Amino acid sequence: ILACGGGVGIAPLLPIIEGFKKAGNRVISVLAARSKDLIILEDEVRKWSDEVIIMTDDGSHGKKGLVTQGAEEVILREKVDECIAIGPAIMMKFTSLLTKKYNIPTQASLNALMVDGTGMCGACRVTVGGKTKFTCVDGPEFDAHQIDFDEMMMRLGGYKKEEKADMEQYMSK
């Protein structure tokens, strides 16, 4: 199992790693963040992983680079039966593109905006395999090779202006 986690996506990845390890799988985890300060739960992930590769954008911890570079390093040296990716949408998109190239089944856990948790509002809708799915009721895990990440990222950015204004108001207090 290749487990790829980025930023706060490492947190929900931890129990998945633990479950795969307890089931007797070899687990290699690739953790990534912009800098050392943003790598979370490293010790806990190490407890349940056979190997951990750390990637940081600035090279302040582990290797300098992206999660996909660490993942491809693993893919090129040993057989990977499945990949799990949780993190920023852009990270999951490029992890999915990488694993698709090597025909590795990949699951992504989406962090789409959710409002009501029932699918009624439609805020978390995402296109998977050409069909509309609702992250809150149909997911959050989906076949990463079927997800329209570009559409999802566009929808995730829909409230950036409001988020920025709220942050500025909060910081000015």
Task: Give the location of each predicted region.
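Short linear functional motifs in flexible/disordered or boundary regions
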Residues: 39-41, 79, 118, 133-136, ...
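FNR/FR-type flavoprotein reductase catalytic core
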Residues: 1-115
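Iron-sulfur (Fe-S) cluster-binding segments and ferredoxin-like electron-carrier domains
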Residues: 96-97, 101-102, 123-161, 172
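Short amphipathic alpha-helical segments
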Residues: 166-173
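Local cysteine-cluster metal-coordination motifs and their immediate loop/turn environment
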Residues: 10-12, 89, 111-141
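Short, surface-exposed, charged/polar-biased interaction segments
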Residues: 48, 66, 73, 88, ...
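Short secondary-structure transition/capping segments
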Residues: 23, 27, 76-82, 106, ...
